[in-house]
Amino acid sequence: MLAGATAHAAELKAVDAPPPSALELSDISGRVHRLSDYRGRVVLVNFWATWCEPCREEMPSLDRLQKQLGTRSFVVLAVNVDEPEARIAKFLSAMPLDFPVLLDAGSKLTRAWKVRVLPASFVISPDGRARYTVTGELDWSAPAVVERIAKLLPGQ
């Protein structure tokens, strides 16, 4: 069972590794997204759930980051962990997001990526390698965070 992160100062932890496993999930509209489809871009993969208060709290900053860096070079993929589509749709009607929300029914991807606490995020560089991980809530629109992610963008 997953736990929600307690209130502590989460930070970007630098790593240099391949993603834990392939990502291939459908979004709430039924469109399939594969991590490989985004090769050449920076991808922020965020695992979350509507019942997770820190997850809900960080969503606006993820949306601001998507809007700030949201060129063809950057995308947020929010992986919802095993919740009914109706619950996710209700959440999205109250908090529209400018990035895809993917459905991990049965938590198969969540387990494959070894996510045990929500929210959990992975920043994947254009070459397909994980460059940062975060466990817990983070203000993704904080200038220092934006700067670190922007440095990964192609042409930077």
Language model region names:
Residues 20-21, 43, 118-120:
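Short loop/turn microsegments at loop-to-beta-strand junctions
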Residues 4-6:
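N-terminal signal peptide c-region/cleavage motif recognized by signal peptidases
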Residues 56-95, 105-112:
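Structural microenvironment flanking redox-active thiols in thiol-disulfide oxidoreductases
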Residues 8-35:
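N-terminal "domain-start" segment that seeds a small globular fold
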Residues 44-46, 76-78, 122-123:
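Hydrophobic beta-strand core positions in alpha/beta domains
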Residues 36-53:
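Short active-site neighborhood of thiol/selenol oxidoreductases, capturing the structured segment around
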Residues 41-43, 73-75, 100:
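Structural signature of beta-strand start/N-cap positions in the alpha/beta core
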Residues 90-98, 104-151:
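Thiol/disulfide oxidoreductase modules built on the thioredoxin-like
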